[in-house]
Amino acid sequence: MSKKRHESISITRSFYQLGTPSFPAYLSLGDNAMLIEGGTGATFAIIVEQIKELGIEPERIKYIALTHTHPDHIGAVPHLKRLWPHLKIAAGSVAAKLLKSQRMIKEFRETDRTISEIMINKGEIAELPPELENYIFEVDKVLEEGDRLELGSGIAWTVYHTPGHSPCHISLCEEKEGTLAIGDATGFYVPEKDVFWPNYFDSLEAYCNSIRKLSTLPAQRGALSHNAVVDGWLEGYFQKAIKATESYHLEMLERLGKGEDPEKIALEKAKWVNSLTDIQTFEVMYSLAKLMLARSQSEAGKEKLFTI
């Protein structure tokens, strides 16, 4: 089966979207360069080809900055490190600990292969990425709140802790051009339908606090880790994200309060998510729907969270 061609997208003069729309990575250019997001195993070859087509020397790329450690955001990392050993992995302190876990690596490999199989079936890649003898995710630069990744020519990214989607989540803001690498901190947004699937997998309260925090940063565009770059209406985007979260949470509480079967609610929500995206299997969506139902149930009574 032939593979689909994936071209890079110029967002600004020094910021490019790589990978695929479903699994983007971003390339920031100063005197040095940095990749933001670790992609998937399946997007590794795509990212390498796009960088080559842009005429960027790999030696210029200093860092791969990870927003968080979910499998669909780190999959290209071991392949890139094997190809370009000089790259330094930059991630938050919580992520640095999680990436040392053998259990995490086992779960990553299973999920990454599933994503690759889905992409083959969609014609986005022609073959599975190569199996590696060792999958190494060791973090070279541990990032804390307020740290700056300086690339030169005025391009510098400031680190912000934005947990809630995951405990290890960070976002990065570049003030010269006003670009905010949001990651998954605001959930899964489908621009074609203007619909949000809230993603408070770790904590509803932390998730809402992170959206509120991001809304205060000096940016005009937001680079999401799936599907889109939001440009020119970032304030409205954050408002939509928080309102969608409130609506989802209150729906869960209302339905549970009426005595509906939690399994039935989760199944219905998984079908809804599956109608929005096919980036994961239905089983994964069902598991996440059950997780979010539990999060809403455990964090009832926190309705004052939903303001910006």
Which residues fall in each region the model found?
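C-terminal regulatory/interaction regions
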Residues: 251-308
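Conserved beta-strand hairpin/beta-sheet module of binuclear metal-dependent hydrolase folds
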Residues: 4-54, 171-184
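Divalent metal-coordination and catalytic microenvironments
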Residues: 14, 28, 37, 47, ...
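Residue-level marker for buried hydrophobic side chains located in beta-strands
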Residues: 34, 65, 89, 179-181, ...
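Short Gly/Pro-enriched turn/cap motifs at secondary-structure boundaries
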Residues: 6, 16-17, 133, 138-140, ...
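Metallo-beta-lactamase
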Residues: 40-42, 156-163, 167-239, 243-249
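Active-site HxH/HxHxD metal-binding segment of metal-dependent hydrolases
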Residues: 44, 52-150, 243
